């Protein structure tokens, strides 16, 4: 079932708390995993705010990092980046392959390598 699949694949709140206690950093990914560039500015703000509020209220994370849903540069826009700043997000990662460099990309468009990118083919 879909519920069983989600229980098997995704972390529950207890597992997240254990990860935080172990020193891992937990960040936001929006509230409902929608493509942000398809939303109005207000809808984007609400998505990002609900995610930030959840992290703050549930895990006391006041300056979360963010990972864009779907990650491609066409799935967010300049309004998204402005809202991340307004809501005090620490930084944000997209799925553009590359080493993280704040000077090159700015703190709200950090590149990264996905684990799939590093797997030998």
Protein language model annotation of sequence segments:
Residues 25-33:
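Histidine-centered catalytic micro-motifs
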Residues 12, 32, 77:
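Residue-level signal for threonine
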Residues 38-121:
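C-terminal active-site subregion of NodB/CE4 polysaccharide deacetylases
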């Amino acid at each position: 079932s879909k519920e069983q699949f989600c229980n098997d694949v995704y972390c529950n709140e207890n597992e997240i708390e254990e990860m935080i206690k172990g020193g891992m950093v937990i960040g936001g990914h929006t509230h409902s995993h929608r493509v942000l560039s398809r939303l109005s500015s207000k809808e984007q703000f609400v998505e990002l705010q609900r995610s930030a509020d959840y992290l703050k209220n549930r895990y006391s994370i006041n300056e979360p990092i963010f990972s864009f849903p779907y990650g491609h540069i066409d799935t967010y826009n300049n309004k998204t980046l402005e809202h991340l700043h307004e809501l005090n997000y620490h930084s944000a990662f997209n799925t553009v392959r590359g080493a993280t460099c704040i000077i090159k990309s700015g703190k709200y468009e950090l590149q990264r390598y996905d684990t799939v990118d590093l797997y030998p083919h």
